[in-house]
């Protein structure tokens, strides 16, 4: 029977075979008994394999429509694994507004190993193709990008990659496997910061890489095992449980985000609102606008005043939790990017990223409304309580 993704995250094919409990047991063990010396047992040492991680990886593979999945100790560990499948003098093409952690990884760490990187405007497939060199091996994109929500045409870039015999990796963190399926669009590898929507509760750090290619899978497993970056049994067990509620969480957060987008578009204090659901290209390759919004204040000198006046959002790094999280990319996710480069890429001091959670949307709107008025010195007539939380 072919199952929907919504059912797949709940159904456990090991139940009734390996155990009878509603949830799989936690195999909190570093090592496993070997009945036969040299007998090639399924599990021997937890870094190499664990039943909880195996179950999680099976679910992640099915969600992304892949044959192989690998769970890592963080999103950046998964990205590192993908890039470390390359060797010295190989060349990679990246978006010019790539996530700050990926920027730091490429600029300060991997360049020591003579892996070469070129950044381009990934919204223009022709620019990507022009950047290809004889030693290019990989095109790596984020779509939507973080934090300016630029959209890359996955089908077009996949066609370029195949024409030049290159690999294409797509960071699908913002959209989740429920909102976008890069492998089905022609990508070779999908990566996630599973800390975000897949985990959804801001209580674990995790990453994932999924592929249909056996050669890539072998390389990813070698790195997972050989560099010791595998996700722990406990975090694998926790993440597998959290995946069960991903469909309802992502659907509700997206619905809430759409309401906040409509509100922010009407505010005169806001210079720009960024939302993937406003892009026809995005909607041609995804079935959802997602639950993350970008917006820019008209007067960036009001940035701290705006933050000070907010009550409901968690002001923090990260995204994809059940709680609404307001992030300031210039001082958080992209702090590792030099200021002049940030400004050139539109990551200015007045830019915010809002990951919308499961709170009542009208209460979030009321809180944002109050904070904008307070920051921009508009008169407050109603009491704070009434203005923030009246329906």
UniProtKB/Swiss-Prot annotation:
pH dependence: Optimum pH is 8.5.
Regulation acting on activity, per entry: Cystathionine beta-lyase activity is inhibited by sweat components such as glycine, serine and ammonium sulfate. Inhibited by cystathionine at a concentration higher than 6 mM.
Coiled coil: none
Cofactors (names): pyridoxal 5'-phosphate
N6-(pyridoxal phosphate)lysine modified-residue sites: 196
Reaction(s) the record says it catalyses: L,L-cystathionine + H2O = L-homocysteine + pyruvate + NH4(+); an S-substituted L-cysteine + H2O = a thiol + pyruvate + NH4(+)
EC number(s) recorded for this UniProt protein: 4.4.1.13
GO cellular component: cytoplasm
Highest taxon in the source lineage: Bacteria
Keyword Amino-acid biosynthesis: yes
GO MF entries: cysteine-S-conjugate beta-lyase activity; pyridoxal phosphate binding
The entry's keywords: Amino-acid biosynthesis, Lyase, Methionine biosynthesis, Pyridoxal phosphate
CDD domains documented for this protein: CGS_like
Thermal characteristics: Optimum temperature is 37 degrees Celsius.
Known pathway: Amino-acid biosynthesis; L-methionine biosynthesis via de novo pathway; L-homocysteine from L-cystathionine: step 1/1
BP GO terms, sorted: methionine biosynthetic process; transsulfuration
Record-stated family: Belongs to the trans-sulfuration enzymes family.
Role: Catalyzes the transformation of cystathionine into homocysteine. Can also catalyze, at low levels, the conversion of cystathionine into methionine and the conversion of methionine into methanethiol.
Oligomeric and partner information: Homotetramer.
Record-given protein name: Cystathionine beta-lyase MetC
Organism this protein belongs to: Staphylococcus haemolyticus (strain JCSC1435)
Encoding gene per record: metC
